[in-house]
């Protein structure tokens, strides 16, 4: 089981996000909803069909699992098109860049005297320091929320801080973080310029998969903005929506989600709040939820 949040969906104060999951053959009939499979039509053409259905309409009611499905289609569509647009090569480059940023951040922190623990990790660093409280205070002044360690503690009684990077992080952001940390511990003169090697990514402590993945045609054919836009429009033309007519009552796969409900997903001033953000930064979200 995993979250698709990193595939083009903002944090949104912790959700909602689409998920992906896999299971062994023995559990496949317990999967909720419908599974679409690829087959060949009688004319020899590639086609898609419903391969497995677990709804009350199709199997005995006591074995149905559709009652635990949720309406996450918009989030799943966003993540799917993010993967389609970037393909396996693009996603690999994004991941390698994040790892490279993380390695540079670790290197800078080590040069400032911080002890960075060994271990396999992707985008996050945990650092324990006697300067933890002061670093948290300085981070807030510079517009950053650092993860408070141990989890559940306050900046005042914390013993460490954590940093996580993503595809929006860059060298300028890392330099800003390192600068205010160096100021706190009195080592500003030890700062060195951050310069990423764009050609040869130094990946360490992460076991990389070498087998091919996302090799289906769908992840290779729509990697320009124009191609993707035309593909989305062709799919939309096949759909039945309010553009075509009223959605019939009782159709559980076609419930109305109004545009006003869906569009805030892309609002930068609403959708980018981290679920661990301090309560004094999330008053608007608390009001919406309550």
Predicted segment positions?
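Active-site C-terminal subdomain of aminotransferase-like
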Residues: 4-119
């Amino acid at each position: 089981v995993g979250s698709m949040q990193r595939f083009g969906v903002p944090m949104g104060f912790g959700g909602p996000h689409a998920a992906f999951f896999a299971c062994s053959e023995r559990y496949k009939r317990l999967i909720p909803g419908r599974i679409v499979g690829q087959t060949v039509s009688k004319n020899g053409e590639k086609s898609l069909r419903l391969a497995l259905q677990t709804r009350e309409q199709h199997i005995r009611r006591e074995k149905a699992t559709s009652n635990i499905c949720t309406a996450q289609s918009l989030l799943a569509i966003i993540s799917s098109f993010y993967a389609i647009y970037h393909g396996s090569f693009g996603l690999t480059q994004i991941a390698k860049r994040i790892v490279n940023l993380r390695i540079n951040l670790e290197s800078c922190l080590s040069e400032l005297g911080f002890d960075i623990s060994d271990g396999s990790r992707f985008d996050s660093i945990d650092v324990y320091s006697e300067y933890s409280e002061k670093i948290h205070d300085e981070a807030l002044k510079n517009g950053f929320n650092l993860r408070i360690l141990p989890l559940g503690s306050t900046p005042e009684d914390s013993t460490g801080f954590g940093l996580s990077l993503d595809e929006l992080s860059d060298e300028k952001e890392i330099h800003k973080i390192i600068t205010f940390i160096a100021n706190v511990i009195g080592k500003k003169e030890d700062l060195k310029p951050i310069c990423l090697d764009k050609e040869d990514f130094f990946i360490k402590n992460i076991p990389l998969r070498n087998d091919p993945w996302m090799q289906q045609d769908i992840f290779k054919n729509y990697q320009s903005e124009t191609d993707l836009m035309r593909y989305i429009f062709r799919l939309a033309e096949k759909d039945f929506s309010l553009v075509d007519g009223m959605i019939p009552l009782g159709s559980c796969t076609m419930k109305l989600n109004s545009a006003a409900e869906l569009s805030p997903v892309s609002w930068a001033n609403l959708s980018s709040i981290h679920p661990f953000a301090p309560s004094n930064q999330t008053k608007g979200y608390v009001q919406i939820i309550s």
